[in-house]
Amino acid sequence: MGAPKILISKTLLQKLYIKENLTPFKIGEKLGCSFKTIRNRLKEHNIPFKNPAYARMTYSKKDFDGSLAEKSYMIGFRIGDLNVYKKSPNSYTVVVRCHTTQKQQVEVIKSIFDKFGRVSISLNNGHFQVNCFMNNSFSFLLKKDDSTWKWIINSDDNTVFNFIAGYIDAEGNFILNQGRARFKIDSYDASILKWISEFLKQKGIHNKLRIIYKAGEKVPSQNPFPKDLWRLNINGMNELQIFLEKLIPFLRHKTRLSQAKESLMNILKRKK
C-alpha cells in the first residue's frame, strides 16, 4: 500500500504560488512535501505555471483594491509629479518613479504605494530618488493623457476633490500675500486646469485661469517654455474658504496641508 496522497486546496496553492509568488520548492518546504507533489497539485487544480518574468519577482505585490476616490487621488498626483513605466510590454511590474528634494513628497509617495509593493528610497546630495514596484493592477497610472482622468469628470464630488488634492499636492501653492490668503497652480496641463476651473465655478468657487507664458517665451536663466504655461488663481476670500474647506480633508502633503490650514485661519481671522 502506497503513501496516502497529500491533499492541498486550490485556494491555499493560489495564495502561496500566485499571491505570495513562492516557488514549488519553497511551497513544498512550507507544507512538508516534495517539489514534485506541489507541481502535481498545481496541474490537478489547473493553476498554470508562471512564466519566467513573473517567477523572477522576488517580493510580493498586492493588487490595487482601493476606492475610486483613492484611485482618483493617485491619478492626480501621478500627473503632477510621477514618472510611471514598464521595462517591457510583457513585464509584470509597473515602476513608479520620482526625483525630488522634498522629504514631504517622499512621505506622500510612500504612504500611497508602500502597502501595495516595494518602495525603494535613496538620498544623494540632497536629492531623493524613489522607485515603487507595483503589479499590473496599477496599469491605470501608465498613461498621462486625458483618457487617464476623463472618467473622473462624471464622478461624485468626493472623487473629484480627491483628484484635485492629488494634483495640488504635486503642483499647487497656498500663500499669504500682503496678509491675505491666495491659491495658485501653474501647469502645462491646459485641459486639466480648464476642467478644474469650470468644475469649481459650478460649485460657486470663482477663479481666474490664464496663460502666464506663451510657448517659446524666455525668461532670464531659463530655457524657452516648451508649451503655454497656465495659471489658475483663487483670490476671493469667500471662494477660497469654500475651496479650502472642501479640499483640506483630502490633502496628504504635509507642507501643502499646513499652508492650506494657515490660509483658512487667515480668512477666518479676517472675517471676525
Regions found by a protein language model. Give the residues of each.
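Internal intein/HINT superfamily modules and their associated LAGLIDADG
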Residues: 2-272
